Regions:
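Short, surface-exposed glycine/acidic/tryptophan-bearing loops
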Residues: 2-53, 69
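Disulfide-stabilized extracellular recognition modules
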Residues: 46-97
Length: 97
């Protein structure tokens, strides 16, 4: 379910590159829509990096993104990837605890 939620978000950030959803709601509302129960959550978004290695390098070199990845309180991760018609890659990591 978490990967499905991340996939939804990857498609959404292709429309609007933001932690806010295209309909104006918080990005984490996708978790509730998918029936995911959590006490804490985080989201990393990226676009343009064509390989998983490159997107991870970018996130690990960014303090805020790295903090999410290394947060020991998060117990689950879902990853979404979407390649738009122009060939731009969109990536999402969703974390929950």
């Amino acid at each position: 379910a978490l990967c499905a939620a991340a996939q939804v978000r990857a498609q959404e950030i292709a429309q609007s590159f933001s932690h806010t959803r295209p309909d104006g709601t918080n990005g984490f509302t996708v978790l509730k829509e998918r029936g995911i129960v959590y006490v804490a959550c985080g989201e990393n978004i990226a676009k343009g990096s064509i390989t998983p290695r490159r997107v991870m390098e970018g996130w690990m070199n960014s303090a805020g993104h790295r903090k999410n990845i290394l947060n020991a309180n998060f117990t689950s991760i879902g990853v979404g990837y979407y390649l738009d018609a122009a060939g731009t890659a969109h990536w999402v990591q969703l974390f929950t605890a």
